[in-house]
Amino acid sequence: MNISVNGQSQVPPGFRFHPTEEELLKYYLRKKISNIKIDLDVIPDIDLNKLEPWDIQEMCKIGTTPQNDWYFYSHKDKKYPTGTRTNRATTVGFWKATGRDKTIYTNGDRIGMRKTLVFYKGRAPHGQKSDWIMHEYRLDESVLISSCGDHDVNVETCDVIGSDEGWVVCRVFKKNNLCKNMISSSPASSVKTPSFNEETIEQLLEVMGQSCKGEIVLDPFLKLPNLECHNNTTITSYQWLIDDQVNNCHVSKVMDPSFITSWAALDRLVASQLNGPNSYSIPAVNETSQSPYHGLNRSGCNTGLTPDYYIPEIDLWNEADFARTTCHLLNGSG
């Protein structure tokens, strides 16, 4: 049934024509070559050499629904009378084959080939490439020969089977339009994404490279920041004790920045030992404040391995430790 009226295709509203490659070959092209009636004939016959891609778009329009691709039958025209090359030149340009032909299979059987062509404006070999692309489908000879056994195939059709001058079915589309429509129809199309050109990307990479070069690997034994101190004499008296404890730790990790940030607290700690008590009560520390003794264990070393603060009541030095500490202090003062 031909649904064209005055050259315009008349189809019901919402009609879409999206045949698969197998359907194009086994149903439409096979019936076209075999002169078998097609139930719904929506593919027109055109002369590819007399029409430009934008003209094909108007002639092959189906209904009023927007289309991304257009289908038509075309008879292959030889470029030279005695040759086998196909003439695909138009008034303003030409169709040039690109890549290898693709084999089309159905149920493991080869049924045809697909050739991809790109439209160039101008004349070869100095044409200007465009966004128009065409897929040209041709039936395999084995499918054509098997069609001769059908009772409704004309004898004249079998006489031309296997020749290179047969019919082909073509699909034409524009690359940019197809990509835009695919993006707009995707679920994530409503999300706005910034557009970057090559120059912008190069600038970003250059900035990222500079920022990476500017990074410095810090020495774990850099000088500690200035401490809050209220008594210079206290610093002089007890600096040797801290240096001795740190040097004996032999740990590779950086000391916690919270390690002894208040000399006044350390002064109270040592004074309590000199005055006699063997234990020192450390105020409870909540999660939002840092203990000045965080990371200080019984040997006075900062291991940096435990994140928990000590409980309020801790025996910092036993009696033997207290005696050794007193001797060190007396010798140092002398």
Swiss-Prot record:
GO terms for cellular component: nucleus. One of its GO terms (molecular function) is transcription cis-regulatory region binding. This is NAC domain-containing protein 66. Transmembrane segments: none annotated. Residues 11-175 form the NAC domain. Residues 111-181 bind DNA. Mostly expressed in anthers. Also present in pollen, base of siliques and inflorescence stems. Pfam families: NAM. It is found in: Nucleus. The NAC domain includes a DNA-binding domain and a dimerization domain. Gene3D superfamilies: NAC domain (2.170.150.80). GO terms for biological process: plant-type secondary cell wall biogenesis; positive regulation of DNA-templated transcription. The keyword Transcription regulation applies. Keywords: DNA-binding, Nucleus, Transcription, Transcription regulation. Transcription activator of genes involved in biosynthesis of secondary walls. Together with NST1, required for the secondary cell wall thickening of the anther endocethium, which is necessary for anther dehiscence. May also regulate the secondary cell wall lignification of other tissues such as tracheary elements. It comes from the Eukaryota.
